[in-house]
Structures are given as C-alpha cells and as structure tokens.
Curated annotation (Swiss-Prot):
One of its GO terms (cellular component) is plasma membrane. Its main location: membrane. This is Uncharacterized lipoprotein YgaO. A lipid is attached at C18 (N-palmitoyl cysteine).
Length: 157
C-alpha cells in the first residue's frame, strides 16, 4: 500500500473515531443513568453509524495492510517506521522532526482555544474531542507532507 493510501486511510479513521467518540459523548449521560437505575427502565440513544463505519474501515485497512506487509511486524510499529535503508531512515527522521515542531506549535494553540471553551460549552460540548483529533491530524499531515517533500529532494523515484 502506498504512503498516500495509508495517509488517506489514517485520516478517514481519525475522522470516524472522532465521530464515534462524539456520538458516545452525546449518549454518555443517558448511558450513565441507564446503568444507575436498578430497574433499567431508562432508555438511551446511541448513534451506531460511526462505530459501524469505523469497524468496517478498520477491517478494510487491516486486510489491505496484511496483504501488503509480512506478518512479522503486523501491529507493533506505525507504518511510518518501515525504513528499508539509510536514506529512508534520514527521511523518517526529518519527517518526525517536522511533525514534532507542528505539535510543538499546535498544542499551545489548542490550550488557548480550550481557555475559551466555557464560553461555548453549551453549544459545542464535545469541543475538546475535536481539538484532540485536530492535533492528531496536524501531526500526521505534517509527517506525510515532510516525508514526501524529503523523498522528492532525495532523488527517489
């Protein structure tokens, strides 16, 4: 599987995981009261669509991953650390540095945004979940973009 395909899958999985967590967050109060009552008479609504889509997308990703990579390192390391030679190790090191710098600047920005969270908590109660996933997406995109840029500069085909 190419790096662009993996990155696209990762972004889709991040989005679906964020949607699933938001759905759970919206239903969490009903779930807590459901388990808190002895009769179990309370009913809660939980949107299962994001969970089903996340499981389906994960299954497709794992199938394609298993097909393209040997079983020796199935889930131990992220896909980004499958260097074949020193050139790829150097590209990975530069991309990790770029990713670190992106997170270094995005975390304080997220902290500033979270300062204002009480002002709109009633309208967007799941805002911290969105912030966490935005940081993950920024980190991943900065890694992939830097890796591709370094790949072009290194003379790779």
């Amino acid at each position: 599987m190419s790096m662009k395909t993996k990155a696209a899958f990762h972004l889709v999985l991040f989005g679906l995981a964020c949607w699933a967590l938001i759905s759970y967050f919206e239903a969490s109060e009903g779930i807590a009261s459901f388990f808190g009552t002895k009769s179990g008479g309370m009913v809660f609504d939980l949107n299962l669509t994001p969970f089903i889509l996340f499981v389906a997308a994960s299954a497709v990703y794992l199938y394609l991953q298993k097909k393209s990579r040997p079983a020796r390192k199935q889930l131990l390391l992220p896909d980004e650390f499958e260097e074949q030679d020193e050139r790829e190790q150097m590209m990975t090191a530069k991309a990790c540095r770029a990713s670190y710098i992106a997170v270094y600047f995005s975390l304080p920005a997220a902290a500033v945004l979270l300062i204002f969270y009480p002002l709109f908590q009633s309208r967007i109660p799941f805002f911290p979940i969105i912030i966490v996933f935005i940081i993950m997406i920024i980190q991943h995109l900065s890694y992939v973009i830097s890796f591709k840029k370094n790949e072009k500069n290194s003379g790779a085909l």
